[in-house]
């Protein structure tokens, strides 16, 4: 089987991939993450996942390369990674007491340019929390580098009232979908 490369430097994505116990390595894709404004959220994450996978695949054409991208959507607004604590506070205020969606695009590009891709959506509802609790959560700095300004795999799970879908999707990589794509590509487990 060809080498497997994760087109990401995300520690959360690497931790999820490590759980599969498949040999792989991670490499930064180094791509522009700006997409056309007319794209829907699901089209945008599909496009970005493809862009990341293809960028690394160009450097390693005989490998299978897995790319992923994630966006948070609440009330029709897309939330990306906050630039600072104030932006994180504003994002979290939009999420508390409401349901939002996490969309993750996954793209697997292989030898000969074979492409397998999918988009996974998970819906989450946050408790209504008081401003003081929100500030204490912000003090933990889990918002740094996270779409939506929280980490459900850490203390952010205490904000979570309900989750519908794949929990690993919320952490950055929908593993049920990833395993399906890897199996379709011919990867064997165990």
Swiss-Prot record:
CDD domains listed in its UniProt record: Maf
Name of this chain's protein: Nucleoside triphosphate pyrophosphatase
Subcellular location: Cytoplasm
Top-level taxon of origin: Bacteria
Gene3D superfamilies reported for this sequence: 3.90.950.10
Residues at the catalytic site: 69
Family: Belongs to the Maf family.
Co-factor(s): a divalent metal cation
Keywords linked to the UniProt accession: Cytoplasm, Hydrolase, Nucleotide metabolism
NCBIfam families registered for this protein in UniProt: maf
Described function: Nucleoside triphosphate pyrophosphatase. May have a dual role in cell division arrest and in preventing the incorporation of modified nucleotides into cellular nucleic acids.
InterPro entries in the record: ITPase-like_fam, Maf-like
Gene Ontology terms describing biological process: nucleotide metabolic process
Coiled-coil spans in chain: none
One Pfam entry name: Maf
Catalytic reaction list: a ribonucleoside 5'-triphosphate + H2O = a ribonucleoside 5'-phosphate + diphosphate + H(+); a 2'-deoxyribonucleoside 5'-triphosphate + H2O = a 2'-deoxyribonucleoside 5'-phosphate + diphosphate + H(+)
Keyword Chaperone carried by entry: no
GO-annotated molecular function: nucleoside triphosphate diphosphatase activity
EC number: 3.6.1.9
UniProt lineage: Bacteria, Pseudomonadati, Myxococcota, Myxococcia, Myxococcales
Keyword Cell membrane: no
One GO term describing the cellular component: cytoplasm
Main subcellular location: cytoplasm
């Amino acid at each position: 089987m060809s080498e497997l490369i994760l087109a990401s430097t995300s520690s959360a994505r690497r931790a999820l991939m490590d759980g599969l116990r498949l040999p792989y390595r991670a490499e930064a894709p180094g791509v522009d993450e700006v997409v056309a404004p007319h794209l829907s959220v699901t089209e945008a994450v599909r496009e970005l996942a493809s862009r990341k996978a293809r960028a690394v695949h160009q450097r390693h054409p005989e490998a299978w390369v897995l790319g992923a991208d994630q966006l948070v959507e609440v009330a029709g607004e897309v939330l990306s990674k906050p630039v600072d604590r104030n932006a994180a506070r504003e994002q979290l205020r939009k999420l508390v007491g409401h349901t939002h969606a996490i969309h993750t695009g996954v793209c697997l590009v292989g030898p000969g340019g074979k492409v397998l891709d999918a988009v996974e959506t998970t819906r989450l509802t946050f408790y209504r929390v008081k401003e003081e609790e929100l500030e204490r959560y912000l003090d933990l700095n889990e918002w740094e580098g996270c779409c939506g300004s929280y980490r459900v795999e850490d203390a952010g799970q205490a904000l979570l009232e309900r989750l519908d879908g794949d929990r690993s999707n919320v952490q950055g990589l929908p593993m049920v979908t990833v395993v399906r794509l890897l199996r379709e590509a011919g990867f064997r487990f165990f």
